[in-house]
């Protein structure tokens, strides 16, 4: 029987599983590690560069969008691999679409950074 947690207990368990998911993605996906490493460099840069607060928020949020998209893509890929390791047209499409979402988020981040900094 599944126990439905409520209140603070639910928040604590949700936080635990979120951190567990981040650790799992970090351990298993090079792209996640690369994006977190890039954020460790670019977020402090965004804090110290001479831009408005709104621009600073946009710079940082664009990096967060990339990481969020990569985490969702990783989840899709892991689920697809669990469903079948065989080559399948629809699984291939799902993985390609997830990859395309990451690519679009990277283009968005590049556009935001170049527009603000140039």
What are the residue ranges of the model-derived segments?
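Hydrophobic alpha-helical transmembrane segments
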Residues: 1-75, 83, 87-95, 99-118
């Amino acid at each position: 029987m599944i126990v439905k947690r409520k209140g603070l207990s639910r928040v604590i368990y949700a936080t635990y599983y979120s951190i567990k998911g981040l650790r799992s993605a970090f351990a298993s996906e090079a792209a996640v590690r690369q994006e977190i490493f890039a954020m460790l460099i670019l977020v402090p840069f965004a804090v110290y560069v001479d831009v408005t607060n709104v621009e600073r928020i946009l710079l940082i949020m664009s990096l967060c969008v990339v990481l969020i998209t990569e985490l969702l893509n990783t989840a899709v890929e892991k689920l697809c691999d669990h469903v079948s390791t065989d080559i399948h047209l629809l699984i291939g499409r799902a993985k390609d679409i997830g990859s395309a979402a990451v690519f679009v988020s990277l283009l968005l981040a590049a556009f935001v950074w170049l527009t603000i900094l140039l």
